[in-house]
Curated annotation (Swiss-Prot):
Record-stated family: Belongs to the phycobilisome linker protein family.
Localization: Cellular thylakoid membrane
Protein name (database record): Phycobilisome 32.1 kDa linker polypeptide, phycocyanin-associated, rod
UniProt source species: Mastigocladus laminosus (Fischerella sp.)
Residue ranges of domain PBS-linker in the record: 2-180
GO aspect biological process, one term: photosynthesis
Main location: membrane
Pfam families, A to Z: CpcD (PF01383), PBS_linker_poly (PF00427)
Bilayer disposition of the protein: Peripheral membrane protein
Amino acid sequence: MAITAAASRLGTEPFSNAAKIELRSDASREEVEAVINAVYRHVLGNDYIMASERLVSAESLLRDGNLTVREFVRSVAKSELYKKKFFYNSFQTRFIELNYKHLLGRAPYDESEIVFHLDLYQNKGYDAEIDSYIDSVEYQNNFGDNIVPYYRGFETQPGQKTVGFNRMFRLYRGYANSDRAQIEGTKPRLARELATNKASSIVGPSGSNPAWGYRPSVDITPRKTLGNAVGENDRVYRIEVTGVRSPGYPSVRRSSYAIIVPYERLSEKIQQIHKLGGKIVSITSA
């Protein structure tokens, strides 16, 4: 059954009647290879992968029955390959958006999810950020140990929020599109929607909508705030920082201090703090 009557126009038709890809105990070699390729396709956002980039050791463990699909997904998400494609050159909030898409098959529901993962990464690091998705009850309930993650955001399931359907189309730009080949680049897609707790209208994939290339970057330019002014209705966050070392700052280690920023500038401010050599102690709602 089609996900919507407009499945062909929205680029979701390939998923409409697709069966879940699961690694069974009696799987043939061809079926195991299909699982491996499906994991690469989904977790790497349909981006091209060269033979030299494949995780040969993890693939071998999976073929020999010494690794579950879940652990293979973890290996891919923690690999240098994944970091090069989605972590090193992306805004941190964009990285979190993609983790939700790649590892849980949906878009973030609200900004509290983004803030939670920003804080988790700052305090516990990259591996803990990845583990938080794969070790979650949500992952276990939907994919278990041997089902390849898929796009749940196009379906209606218990526990899902309907706002996730619209937002999924800000992250998914068509079956043949990859997450590194989109016109908006490495910038976050959902910053404004999450900050205002609203969902935008659905825009068809880039190949099906001639006006797509002219879309304004509404998620990048603040609409309510100018300069240092914070609109009354904007949510703001408190970032506690310590240890800034940069020209213009005292050479003695600074004690902790806090700054207040609107949600839509959170990622930008975090990058600025890192460039100044600062360490983020916590991120909390102000």
